């Protein structure tokens, strides 16, 4: 997940009592009921097991890396085990951003080791510092307004630290995306960003940033607060040199080294596409999707191995049914979601003559915990009412049947399709740890504890939740495709 989530989105909950309507024809309902039953089979841990095998073998799937290619080959080999599926790849040009050696050291002269090594992660797309690095004082700010108030006089020649506490990804993400660009305007030589999370165990969180001429990196919440306290004590001591320990309160000063390199259009790598062809209208398409690329830390189990493999798992469940859906159900594992959306843009361009044949596009890219439902973007009120009834009537036993209306594309990869006017949905789950309704602004706090960190490993995910997600997504796809 990269994009800003649902800021200012419109949340409408529709409760339609529809016990009296039999909306699905019996033949469709039978298939949907079987998919729901598959979701209850406690012995089936295949979605988790397969994702574990692939990620154990190849590690992360950073776009343009060799691991991305090997993982994609693993899927293309795996898909041969299933009958009734047609799989192919569609290449797109991708840039390769390599972080290489990087570090932040904080000068604390009272410690035995005066250069304290801080865990950090350079932000994707950042320029490097060169091997010599840069050394400068750090000026903490909690907002862009504060940056502007301090202005060139205070900022020029220094490194800006954005230390805002976690509110939501949308609110805090602006400092990661635009922090360096804005700081540069006031003559800053670098930017540090407090990692975007409400809960930290000294884990830095990376993520992409908008182009800027100065380097930028994420540090942990703990170190962001340490630097802020040092700065505040230093300012106090400057105003009043008589306070106790004033001479010990040095200005926070760091050495930032980033050998990051960006290789434009380094290689061509695929979106992975897998179809179960429809029996009556094979040219009409319902998409289930997640992105296949990940960051270069952890293994991208949660972001977005879970979304990609629950989509794929859904298709495998559908392949076990006694008959095919009327329309084609297409799984897409998108490339390059985490930085430049070349996968989404490439698909849109390559399929521009058949966009009108796309009936629905779903993506799962905000965690796969207990199924909750879909965030629907559609101007069609009939469709909203219909899906609300579908979800409530056919999915309550495994969850995933709630429907909420949003007025912005719910996920990055389906964004072009949603914007084109294809009804689309983000598949969302009850948040890990907080179990909050996902349509509240901070409803994804548990997800963001792991997002873009070394800790995004298989242990974040639960095999039974993944199976239920796959079954719920399969049921949605089948209901829509069989209409
Ligand atoms: C701030 O400093 C930058 C870099 O030194 C300079 O380009 C810019 O014009 C300055 N802006 C203001 C408002 O002084
Ligand atoms: C890289 O690829 C993109 C998209 O495929 C293209 O628009 C761009 O012109 C290419 N850039 C270079 C430097 O080749
Ligand atoms: C709205 O959705 C309904 C139900 O799927 C469909 O029958 C109808 O054609 C749609 N209307 C438009 C304008 O797309
Ligand atoms: C809707 O979400 C709630 C949890 O917020 C869950 O208990 C319920 O089963 C869901 N409903 C459906 C129809 O999936
Ligand atoms: Zn993602």
Label for each model-derived stretch:
Residues 23-65, 205-207, 293-294, 360, ...:
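N-terminal capping segment at the start of a domain
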Residues 31-41, 56-67, 136-141, 165-180, ...:
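Second-shell loop/turn segments in exported
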Residues 65, 116-218, 299, 403:
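Extracellular/luminal Protease-associated
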Residues 121, 125-151, 208-301, 320:
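Soluble metallo-hydrolase cores and metallopeptidase-like ectodomains found primarily
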Residues 216, 224-225, 231-232, 281, ...:
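Metal-dependent peptidase/peptidase-like ectodomains
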Residues 272, 284, 288-341, 473:
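Alpha-helical metal-binding/catalytic segments enriched in His/Glu/Asp
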Residues 327, 434-483:
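His/Asp/Glu-rich mid-to-C-terminal helical/loop segments that flank catalytic regions of hydrolases
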């Amino acid at each position: 997940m990269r994009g800003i989530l649902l800021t200012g989105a419109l949340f409408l909950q529709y409760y339609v009592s529809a016990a009296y309507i039999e909306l699905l024809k019996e033949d469709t309902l039978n298939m949907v009921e079987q998919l729901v039953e598959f979701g209850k089979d406690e012995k089936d841990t295949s979605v988790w097991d397969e994702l574990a095998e692939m990620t154990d073998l190849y590690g992360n799937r950073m776009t343009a890396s060799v691991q991305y290619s090997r993982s994609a080959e693993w899927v293309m080999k795996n898909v041969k085990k299933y009958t009734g599926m047609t799989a192919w790849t569609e290449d797109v040009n991708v840039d390769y951003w390599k972080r290489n050696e990087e570090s932040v050291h904080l000068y604390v002269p009272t410690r035995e080791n005066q250069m304290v090594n801080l865990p950090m992660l350079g932000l994707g797309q950042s320029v490097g510092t060169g091997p010599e690095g840069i050394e400068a004082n750090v000026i903490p700010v909690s907002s862009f307004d504060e940056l502007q108030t301090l202005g060139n006089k205070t900022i020029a020649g220094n490194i800006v630290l954005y230390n805002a506490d976690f509110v939501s990804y949308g609110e805090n993400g602006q400092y990661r995306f635009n922090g360096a660009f804005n700081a540069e305007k006031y003559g800053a030589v670098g930017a540090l960003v407090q990692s975007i999370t409400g809960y930290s165990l000294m884990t830095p969180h990376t993520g992409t940033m908008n182009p800027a001429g100065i380097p930028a990196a994420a540090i942990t919440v703990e170190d962001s607060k340490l630097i802020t306290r040092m700065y505040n004590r230093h300012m106090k001591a400057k105003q009043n040199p008589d306070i106790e320990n004033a001479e010990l309160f040095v200005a926070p000063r760091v050495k930032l080294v980033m050998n990051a390199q960006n290789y434009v259009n380094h290689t061509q790598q695929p979106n992975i596409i897998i179809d179960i062809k429809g029996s009556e209208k094979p040219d009409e398409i319902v998409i289930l999707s997640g992105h296949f690329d990940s960051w270069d830390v952890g293994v991208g189990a949660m972001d977005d191995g879970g979304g990609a493999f629950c989509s794929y798992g859904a298709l495998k469940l559908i392949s076990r049914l006694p008959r095919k859906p009327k329309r084609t159900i297409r799984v897409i594992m998108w490339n390059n979601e985490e930085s430049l959306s070349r996968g989404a843009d490439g698909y849109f361009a390559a399929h521009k003559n058949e966009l009108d044949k796309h009936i629905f596009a779903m993506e799962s890219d905000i965690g796969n915990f207990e199924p909750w439902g879909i965030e629907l973007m559609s101007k069609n009120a009939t469709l909203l009412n219909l899906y609300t009834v579908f979800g409530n009537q056919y999915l309550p036993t495994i969850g995933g049947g709630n429907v909420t209306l949003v007025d912005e594309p719910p996920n990055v990869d389906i964004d072009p399709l949603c914007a084109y006017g294809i009804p689309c949905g983000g598949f969302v789950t009850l948040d890990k740890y907080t179990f909050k309704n996902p349509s509240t602004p901070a409803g994804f706090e548990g997800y963001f504890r792991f997002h873009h960190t070394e800790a995004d490993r298989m242990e974040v995910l639960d095999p039974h939740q993944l199976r239920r997600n796959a079954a719920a997504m399969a049921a949605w796809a089948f209901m829509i495709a069989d209409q």
